[in-house]
Amino acid sequence: MHSTRSTLVILAALVLNASLLFAQEKKPRVSPHETVNATVGEAKITIVCGRPYTKDPKSGEKRKIWGGLVPYGKVWRMGADEATLLTTDKAISIGGTAIEAGTYSLYLLPAEEGAKLIVNKQTGQWGTKYDESQDLVRIDLKKQTLDAPVDQFAIAVEKTAADGVLKLTWENTQYSAAIAVKK
């Protein structure tokens, strides 16, 4: 009898805890997420990333991004929340570096004079859980200063005559690299 009562108390506590977990309201993300779909040659490319703003979500104050919020010389998750994902259904090259078909996490290693795009084999992790041993390649990106600032981080794949250009834009800076189907 005593063990039945204990079992019922434990069962009731578990049910109550489970219902509290499911009843929690999901809050909207501070940084919206975006899926970029592009076709380069015959390759279908998808990039999923969080898009943080220049303004601090709590104070509303404008932040210095490059060399501030995103420090030079430190790996950045390239967006907000989970690691940014790149999926390609065909082998491609970015900045002349070959990448086989598959899904990868993208990171950025910014410096004052440029940046390196890091293509990492580990996926599904929170953006700050970077494991350098899983790096597939590091690709040099071109840096360009923009005439007008961009308030929200953006990733785009823009078509060119035959291939495309990967562009990462935020604040007053754009990083880019050619993207093509691997031949």
Segments from the language model and where they lie:
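Primarily secretory-pathway and cell-envelope proteins
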Residues: 24-74, 123-183
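Bacterial N-terminal signal peptides that target proteins for export
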Residues: 1-10
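Sec/Tat signal peptide C-region and signal peptidase I cleavage site
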Residues: 19-23
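Mid-length scaffold segments of soluble, non-membrane domains
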Residues: 74-125, 129
